[in-house]
Regions:
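Bacterial N-terminal signal peptides
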Residues: 7-17
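N-terminal pre-domain segments of enzymes
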Residues: 20-52
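Extracytoplasmic/lumenal domain signature
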Residues: 57-71, 99-120, 131, 143-164, ...
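Non-catalytic accessory segments flanking enzyme active sites
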Residues: 44-69, 73, 83
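Positively charged n-region of N-terminal signal peptides that target proteins for export
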Residues: 1-5
Length: 527
């Protein structure tokens, strides 16, 4: 079946035609070492590279190869949150309303595209999706735009959400067969979330999966009424992962709305705060698992669902793992959503236990109150959107974590409060890089950061290395097996995306963003 599905995908995509700079669909399934063709490197979300020319033995010889500062003009002040894509020696990355193509060897600009935005939240953009000779990206004012790779000229644009309802768009599109998968953002008004599939040729809508069910549909029993569902939230602002053999997209959904005051939405509020498996061809829900039922702490469960095959109790299983914002680590059978492991990866205090499905049970005592409730983790979460990594070589799941507390309080006790209906104030926090054993859920090692906590993307490689950022604006390399610090470079600003690596002309490059600048590192001078 896997072979048949791959052949069908190849048949469709061959009709697109592949020019000299184009992306072959095979690289999305098993990327070559000279590319980073999609948001997580491949469909799995592992952010693991088989490259090892840069390794634990020679890391101290790493040098700066080039620097590229993105200067979009105007009042845009956003950091580079996008993961750069590398295809045939060209790197593509985004800021809100902007796309650049640069030489991946030198950092020289090839072209720069600017979208004339009509508004929207310019908080960040997580990148582009590419297939064939076509690039796709989302804009803050709710459009999906397609460009040609060679010159950056616009092919088409399509509206994917309603700016007047305070939606905006920031996710990196994912291409699965003949589907461009796009999500939406927005917490300022009580609006429902959804995921869409768009045609690569025209941008026309193929299907839409709504996070909130309709009255009478499965999941509607977890809401008090139709009005609560119609305003229920659950944004889809981080890219999905994809299993081509099962033809399932794996999506983490955001928090319900109103965000803090949950009095008017009693129940678990499906399918917000869920890991959802969705058929890529039909948009139908195959299964779901809910890390944070009835969330009232803004703990979006959008963290990357990482896919890998592993051994559990002596048997090979198709697995999915997520280090969720609520402080809990989950391993699921990705064929059916059944729970395999549930464990804390930071100490939390918001649950009263774990139910038979492996889902944490919220403690009523930790619900936001008029006089406040002290809750761990804080609103920023034990993890956030920043991508984790999984190494098949070590069997460890790597995630930047934060242990922190917030006092959550409501200021509007009405069932239909104004805005979020409450807020939080954070206090003590500590940050750390953690390696989790997927077989047990235990933290194998933890590397604590000095100073304040923070969230940073992660990359692991066959060179026995893990790359990430720290609160002191350093780009850091750790030993993948022990967590020992091996190397760092101060970038002058915090790491703002997930690092990537690729090899061109025999040289392995590492690229990371800090603020508005891309930094490329390599072993120079034949070292």
């Amino acid at each position: 079946m896997k072979t048949i599905r791959l052949l069908l995908a190849m048949t469709f995509l061959s009709a697109i035609g592949f020019g000299q700079g184009s992306l072959s669909p095979a690289k999305l399934l098993a990327p070559a070492t000279d590319s980073w063709p999609t948001y997580n490197g491949d469909y799995s979300g592992r952010r693991y590279s088989t490259l090892s020319k840069i390794n634990a033995d020679n890391i101290n010889s790493l040098s700066l190869a080039w620097v590229f500062r993105a200067v979009p003009g105007g009042n845009l002040n956003a950091a580079i949150k996008s993961t750069p894509l590398v295809i045939n020696g060209v790197m593509y990355f985004t800021l809100p309303d902007h796309v650049w193509a640069i030489d991946a060897r030198t950092g020289r600009q090839i072209w720069h595209y600017t979208w004339q935005s009509q508004g929207g939240d310019h908080i960040g953009n997580r990148g582009a999706g590419i297939i064939g000779d076509w690039l796709f990206f989302e804009t803050p004012d709710c459009h999906l735009v397609s460009l040609d790779l060679k010159e950056g000229k616009e092919r088409w644009n399509q509206k994917i959400c309603d700016l007047n309802q305070y939606y905006f768009a920031s996710a990196a599109p994912i291409i699965a067969k003949n589907h461009v998968i796009v999500g939406v953002s927005g917490d300022d008004l009580d609006i429902p979330g959804y995921l869409q599939s768009r045609s690569p040729e025209t941008g026309e809508l193929q299907w839409q999966w709504n996070v909130e069910p309709k009255p009478g549909e499965p999941g509607s029993e977890t809401w008090p009424n139709a009005e609560a569902m119609a305003h229920g939230g659950g944004m889809t602002w981080v890219p999905s992962t994809y299993d081509p053999e099962l033809n399932l997209l794996y999506l983490g959904t955001g928090n319900p709305q109103p965000v803090i005051a949950g009095k008017g939405r009693k129940g678990d509020n499906l399918y917000t705060e869920s890991i959802a498996a969705i058929n890529a061809d039909t948009g139908k829900l195959a299964w779901h698992f809910q890390p944070s039922p009835h969330d009232t702490h803004d703990w979006d469960a959008v963290q990357t669902p990482v896919l890998f095959d592993g051994e559990i109790n002596g048997q090979s299983r198709k697995l999915l793992a997520q280090a969720s914002r609520n402080g809990w680590f989950f391993v699921l059978d990705r064929t059916n959503g059944k729970n395999v492991i549930t464990s804390e990866f930071v100490k939390t205090n918001w649950t009263s236990g774990v139910d038979a499905k492996g889902q944490p049970v919220p403690s009523v005592a930790k619900e936001p109150k008029l006089d406040g409730a002290l809750v761990s983790p804080n609103q920023g979460g034990a993890a956030n959107w920043h991508p984790p990594s999984y190494s098949p070589e070590t069997g460890l799941f790597y995630v930047n974590s934060t242990r922190a507390f917030s006092v959550y309080y409501i200021f509007d006790d009405d069932e239909k409060p104004e805005g979020w209906g409450g807020n939080d104030r954070s206090g003590f926090s500590e940050g750390m890089m953690q390696a989790i054993d997927y077989k047990t859920g235990n933290v194998r090692w933890s590397h604590k950061w000095e100073g304040a906590s923070g969230h940073y993307g992660v990359l692991s490689t066959a060179g026995n290395l893990v790359f990430t950022g720290d609160p002191s604006n350093n780009f850091v390399a750790l030993n993948a097996r022990t967590g020992d610090a091996l190397w760092h470079a101060n970038l002058g600003a915090g790491v703002s995306n997930g690092p990537i690596t690729y090899e061109l002309d025999g040289t392995q490059y590492l690229v990371v963003a800090a603020g508005d600048t891309l930094f490329a590192f390599a072993m120079l001078g034949g070292k």
